[in-house]
């Protein structure tokens, strides 16, 4: 029971973190003030093509993360890391799994993903590559550092590519790969086509539908976004789905519908940061009615 409650709390906190990060890094009407808008964001919201990203150093990432936690937890991590370094090669995967879980429990997705990648390289199963790809995507979504984001996205892309090699029909692998392509690892429409194919075969696939919905918002296709998020809410209501629905309505000047969607997001999220944002947003929209 306690584990279920904790998992739900972590999911909600993570969802809000991703949502807030999305809101404040996209040039979408109503979400940023004119003076805060940037002019160098590529069309569609994807990352601009660049040179090969700098590799991620696991030791540096670990040290940075440990500096943010209490001494006892840091010591526990260090002890596991020392065990991993001293393990025989055939024992390293088991310790890497423990470290990946420990880092995930502490909400540090980057070192967790790096250890999962080690496991996947040693035990190349479909599930291992899917978990690795998902963790790198989580790290990508939660990270605002433009220097490390490309490397995280590339690693996610590589993990899902490896998963596709093992099972090219797997919807989770195809969805993950499509998301990385849409976000900058290729031509966005190629990624959209992959996600559309997933939804065609599995209309209730939340991950693929959410990705298509957010891309519709990023690219200014608000009518399509409304339909997509209405479908998502019919499958499984969530704070972020309602918020994105409100965003789409607002951008089309449908303020009454936007307010209703925003308030539904606030009710489901029960998050102070998002509640304050929504309260301010609702006040602003009521003045426009």
Regions found by a protein language model. Name each.
Residues 2-110:
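N-terminal leader/linker segments that initiate helical-solenoid repeat arrays
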Residues 90, 123-124, 168, 203, ...:
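Short coil turns that delineate tetratricopeptide repeat
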Residues 95, 128-129, 173, 208, ...:
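TPR alpha-solenoid repeat register
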Residues 98, 131, 135, 176-177, ...:
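Canonical tetratricopeptide repeat
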Residues 101, 121, 134, 179, ...:
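Residue-level recognition of tetratricopeptide repeat
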Residues 106, 139, 184-185, 219, ...:
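Structural motif corresponding to the intra-repeat A-B loop/turn of tetratricopeptide repeats
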